[in-house]
């Protein structure tokens, strides 16, 4: 069929592509990943087979140090980046990291724009009810971050104040579930790092976000030296989410077992200052 495409149509396609701009957007990359694997989807007997037939695991993430981020040398790295790469080696596939909108992560997962959500994702009741998840692999907590010098005794001090969190995140859920924080002026942001920017700039009084990110990005020697953790709201754990009913989650659990046994996961936890789940 390709031989029958006319020069007119080829030109039209070129104009259409040019109108889209230069660099590919996240949605463009995700759409390409989904369409490029259509044949595998039709023939695969299971979700794991589908992934293996494609030869790659498409991983949805947001920029989040120390889990998935670009370091000073320009290398894409992080605890989850390295762990996912090690798991993919066990599965015999290549990792492909696609930046997503965290608030629509399950929608992108179900649409097969991505194969999994692997980005310091809290194992909430909602996630576990709507996806197939791995066992917990790392510990975390939701914390309150404010500017140094801010008077803070409890979440009651934030009633009526501006509080930010990432849309669709465990931080947002923590705000909604706290009697005092629920009375704050809540503003959602696209990513957790934007929350730190708002507090540092003084446009927000506090942020609720992951302890792992706060430990990596605030305090002495960081870009956010003026910020500090003042409260820990709740303990939680991270896991990886696949499509509901997927057998790939169990395969990743098996890979985790091997990577724990050979010391890989502990070495990564020490490298990125994280605590592995029990």
List where the protein language model places each region:
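Short helices/loops that flank or line small-molecule/ion binding pockets
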Residues: 89-90, 98-99, 103-117, 130-132, ...
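A ligand-binding cleft/hinge motif common to bilobed small-molecule-binding domains
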Residues: 121-129, 174-177, 200-201, 205-234
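Periplasmic-binding protein-like
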Residues: 139-146, 211, 215, 219-257, ...
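Extended ligand-binding regions for polar small-molecule ligands
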Residues: 81-90, 162, 169, 215, ...
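Flexible hinge/capping segments at coil-to-helix
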Residues: 28, 146-163
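Bacterial lipoprotein signal-peptidase II cleavage site
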Residues: 17-37
């Amino acid at each position: 069929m390709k031989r029958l495409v006319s020069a007119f149509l080829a030109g039209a396609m070129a104009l259409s592509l040019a109108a889209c701009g230069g660099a590919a957007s996240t949605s463009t990359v995700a759409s390409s990943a989904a369409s490029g694997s259509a044949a595998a989807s039709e023939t695969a007997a299971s979700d794991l087979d589908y992934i293996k037939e494609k030869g790659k695991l498409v991983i949805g993430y947001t920029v989040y140090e120390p889990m998935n981020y670009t370091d000073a040398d320009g290398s894409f790295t992080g605890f989850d980046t390295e762990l996912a790469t090690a798991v993919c080696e066990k599965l015999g596939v290549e990792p492909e990291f696609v930046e997503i909108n965290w608030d629509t992560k399950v929608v992108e997962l179900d649409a097969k724009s991505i194969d999994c959500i692997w980005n310091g994702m809290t194992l909430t009741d909602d996630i576990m009810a709507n996806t197939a998840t791995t066992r917990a692999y790392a510990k975390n907590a939701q914390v309150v971050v404010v500017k140094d010098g801010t008077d803070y005794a409890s979440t009651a001090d934030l009633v009526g104040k501006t509080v930010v969190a990432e849309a669709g995140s465990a931080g947002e859920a923590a705000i909604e579930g706290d009697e005092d924080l629920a009375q704050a002026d809540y503003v959602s942001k696209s990513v957790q790092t934007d929350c730190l920017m708002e507090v540092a700039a003084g446009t927000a009084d506090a942020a609720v976000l992951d302890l792992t990110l706060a430990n990596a990005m605030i305090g002495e020697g960081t870009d956010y030296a003026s910020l500090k953790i003042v409260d820990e709201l709740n303990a939680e754990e991270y896991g990886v989410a696949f499509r509901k009913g997927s057998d790939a989650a169990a395969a990743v659990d098996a890979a985790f077992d091997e990577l724990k046994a050979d010391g890989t996961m502990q070495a990564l936890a020490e490298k990125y200052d994280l605590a592995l789940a029990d």
